[in-house]
Amino acid sequence: MEQKVLDILKALFELETVDTSISQENCENWDSMGQLNLVAELEMEFDISLEPEEIGVMISYKDIVNLLKSKGVK
């Protein structure tokens, strides 16, 4: 699951490379529209539904992975 999240982030934000330190703070393309696209990709890829309060705390790779794990994604 962790590698798939990295792959999604890399493709979605059009990055040449990506690592586990990626966050909204260090990714220029991770803006509000990028966040909406990210949510759609994650929901589709992992067959989950994200609540608005969950979406608001997804500001880094680590936050995304922790949230997915809390939803039982492996």
Report residues per predicted region.
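C-terminal structural segments of small proteins and small subunits
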Residues: 49-74
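Amphipathic alpha-helical interaction surfaces in cytosolic regulatory modules
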Residues: 31-39, 59-61
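Phosphopantetheine carrier-protein modules
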Residues: 11-29, 45-53, 57
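Functionally critical, cavity-lining and gating residues within the transmembrane helices
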Residues: 2, 35, 48
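Thiotemplate assembly-line natural product biosynthesis machinery
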Residues: 1-18, 70-74
